[in-house]
């Protein structure tokens, strides 16, 4: 991960000059991506395109860019999702809903943590302050499926 301050300065310098709420836009980008370089690059590039070419309102541009990324990767996410077993899906749904892993009473604790270990080894889950789905756009896609 790149330090928040360094990343925010880098993005701020590159957003279009006519964007009046640059700081808010950058904060929304970095809070969504948690300063992960790959996901930040994806989101920031799309935000830049929307601000520069589509002249979208800065107040809504990040949310629209996220929705576009989720929609763009829908088939990829669906394919990934279908390859998970029922336990992995349950764990992922719990993680995106901020449910504590230990409080999942539908599955034995050892099963939950075996699933987390498997998902971490596959690169879908990481542990920062807590376990979470690494790809913020995949996490959003999972949340939308639950709704």
Would you name each region that the model predicts?
Residues 106-122, 126-128, 132:
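Short amphipathic alpha-helical interaction segments
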Residues 138-147:
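Short, amphipathic alpha-helical interaction segments positioned at domain boundaries
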Residues 1-25:
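Conserved small helical "lid"/interfacial subdomain of P-loop NTPases
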């Amino acid at each position: 991960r790149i330090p928040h301050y360094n990343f925010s300065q880098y993005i701020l310098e590159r957003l279009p000059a006519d964007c009046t709420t640059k700081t808010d836009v950058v904060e929304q980008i970095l809070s969504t991506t948690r300063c992960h370089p790959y996901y930040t690059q994806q989101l920031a590039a799309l935000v830049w395109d929307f601000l520069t070419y589509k002249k979208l309102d800065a107040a809504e541009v990040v949310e629209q860019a996220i929705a576009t990324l989720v929609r763009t990767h829908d088939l990829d996410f669906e394919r990934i999702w279908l390859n998970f077993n029922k336990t992995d899906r349950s764990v992922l749904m719990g993680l995106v809903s901020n449910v504590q892993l230990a409080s999942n009473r539908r599955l034995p604790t050892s099963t939950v943590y075996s699933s987390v270990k498997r998902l971490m080894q596959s690169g879908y889950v990481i542990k920062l302050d807590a376990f979470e789905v690494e790809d913020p756009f995949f996490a959003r896609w999972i949340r939308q499926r639950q709704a």
